[in-house]
Regions:
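Helix-to-loop junction immediately C-terminal to a conserved catalytic motif
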Residues: 56, 352
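The feature captures the beta-strand-to-loop junction immediately N-terminal to the Walker
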Residues: 41-43, 337-339
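Conserved ABC ATPase "signature" region
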Residues: 122-140, 413-431
């Protein structure tokens, strides 16, 4: 039998960026074999993106640096090759699909690489059509990129790299900008493509539970520029390495730990549906549920933000929001959820005054906001956009965060104290004198959050506040927001992160096709399968676990878990 040869091989490999004093990767030894599905996980700054950049050639050809050791990619000596040559072996799907579009239509974008290689037109059309069919986008070849949803854009990006018939597909945080249902479909698509083509698949992602919706062969855990673990999912989830290195384990695994269940590889904890629980394990969960008190009822609150009969459309005859009405109380922490294109971001623009409603009114502290201009609204409502590049206007991190305080009447010393305190909370203090251009997408996101939080607004409205964040920075940001909320600041978050919704907000507003279809507790939303499907959300694995163990009502199981999780985060039992 012939010896199996790796398609990717790192041997004693180190990489140091030209602008850095120390190597970002140190003594990497890793082999990945043809047809494998490998998840590369690690906290922000761990080196996982640098590792991926060495595989696809971005390092050192676009990001100059020095390599030692060897790296072979599909038989090619990667550090001594070229970006062009490596692109014939490795196809990369970026975190932000908008950054990968080149053509004016879907068809043109998919065919771009074929045009560069002077492929005959008839052959080009056939290959483009086949790639589009493979990813299920064949009916959109004439569409412009802006006419596509986030999930459709990602499919186009995938088709664009598959026309080269690459042997390796690398996905850089493929779930970061997708709603839960579309993210689930993305993982299913990656799994389907891998099975059809036997392509080697590498996924860089923070959202471990979502990636494990479909099987992966191994999880490579990276931190501090080294590989800490290279294990099967069942093995890694049985230990404590994930939590120790800032990676969130699946919620059902945490629930089992709270109940005192011993998690071992033979219980197959990689997916809630494959989980093997004996009678003793099930009884431990039931006993834990019985022993936990019901969460206290939430008090009635004086309204802060009131929306009444709100309707809006960007074009005549097309309504993005239809007759939306709700009230948010002072000191509440609320999630706004729903599929991409449901109207969530449009609602935030109307609240901030960036757009004017066609009908309806918005009130803050009982006063109509229509009488306030954008500048005056901003004194009360802080808004953090989803895309940090659309907010940043300064070159340096410190200057960006301090910008809003320049006309506040504070002294330079007072400004410095406020800015540095906020930077510490957001995990940016070590980078305070860095240029923003040197930051990752996730780090830029933290800069924009810091620039709003430093102003102490009455209400903070955040569009995807934790997108691209590892669990440690996610927790730092959310605990900071929770601390503000505990002091009476109202926090409203537009999010695709169902964990965030459950863990930090007791109430969720659910949107679908421009309408508010539910206003319920977060647990109630994710324990309603019909609502979950309608709004393109994702059932929590806690709901599945409760049903498997015969614990009813499942919603109370979820609520009691979340309550204990809050206690643990706050240093309780």
């Amino acid at each position: 039998m012939a010896e199996r040869k790796p398609i990717i091989s790192f041997r004693n490999f180190s990489f140091q960026y030209r602008a850095q004093k120390r190597p970002t990767l140190t003594d990497i030894n890793l082999e990945i074999y043809p047809g494998e599905r490998v998840l590369i996980a690690g906290p922000s700054g761990s080196g996982k993106s640098t590792l991926a950049g060495c595989i696809n050639g971005l390092n050192p050809f676009s990001n100059p640096g020095a390599c030692t050791g060897t790296l072979t990619v599909d038989g090619v000596d990667a550090p001594h090759s070229s970006l062009f040559e490596l692109s014939a072996h490795v196809g990369t799907v970026l975190q932000d699909p908008d950054g990968q579009f080149i053509g004016l239509t879907v068809g043109e974008d998919i065919a771009f690489a074929l045009e560069n290689s002077c492929t005959p037109q008839d052959e080009m059309y056939a290959i483009t059509r086949h790639a589009a069919e493979l990813v299920g986008i064949e009916n959109h070849l004439g569409y412009a990129p802006h006419e596509l949803s986030g999930g459709q854009k990602q499919r186009v990006s995938l088709a664009g790299v598959m026309v080269d018939q690459v042997k390796i597909l690398l996905f850089d945080e493929p779930l970061a900008n997708l709603d839960p249902a579309t993210g689930k479909q993305a993982i299913e698509l990656i799994d389907e493509i891998q099975k059809k083509t036997d392509t080697t698949v590498l996924i860089i992602e923070h959202r471990l539970e979502d990636v494990l919706w479909r099987n992966v062969d191994r999880i490579v855990l990276v931190n501090g520029g080294t590989i800490l673990a290279d294990l099967r999912p069942d093995e890694l989830l049985s230990g404590s390495l994930l939590a120790e290195n800032g990676i969130r384990e699946p919620l059902y695994v945490t629930a089992l730990r709270y109940a005192g269940v011993d998690i071992t590889p033979d219980k197959h904890p990689a997916h809630v549906d494959s989980l093997v629980l004996d009678d003793t394990d099930t009884q431990k969960l039931r006993d834990w549920f019985t022993a936990r008190p019901r969460p206290a009822a939430q008090p009635e609150r004086e309204p802060l933000l009131e929306v009444k009969g709100l309707s809006f459309g960007y074009q005549k005859g097309q309504q993005t929001l239809r007759d939306v009405g709700f009230s948010i109380g002072k000191g509440e922490m609320v999630s706004i959820v729903g599929r991409n294109g449901a109207g969530k971001s449009t609602l935030s623009k109307l609240i901030c005054g960036f757009e004017t409603p066609d009908a309806g009114e918005i009130f803050l502290n009982g006063k109509p906001l229509a009488e306030e201009n954008i500048r005056r609204r901003a004194q009360h409502i802080g808004y953090v956009m989803q895309n940090p590049n659309q907010m940043i206007s300064k070159t340096m991190i410190y200057d960006e965060v301090a910008l809003g305080l320049q006309r506040s009447g504070l002294t330079e010393e007072q400004i410095r104290e406020k800015v540095e305190a906020t930077l510490r909370v957001c995990g940016l203090y070590p980078f305070r004198n860095w240029p923003i251009s040197a930051l990752s997408f996730g780090q830029k996101k933290r800069v924009t959050i810091a620039s709003v939080l430093v102003l102490d607004p009455e209400l903070i409205l955040l569009d995807e506040p934790t997108a691209g964040q590892d669990f440690r920075h996610y927790t730092d940001i959310m605990e900071f927001l929770r601390g503000l909320n505990a002091r009476g600041v109202t926090v409203v978050m537009i999010t695709h992160d169902m964990h965030l919704m459950l863990e930090y907000t007791r109430r969720a507003l659910v949107f679908c096709d421009g309408r508010l279809i539910a206003d319920r507790t977060a647990a109630a939303v994710l324990c309603d399968p019909a609502l979950v499907e309608q709004a393109a959300l994702k059932e929590t694995s806690l709901y599945t676990l409760a049903n498997r163990c015969g614990i009813a009502p499942a919603q109370e199981f979820v609520e009691r878990f979340i309550e204990q999780d809050r206690e643990v985060r706050e240093g309780g039992c």
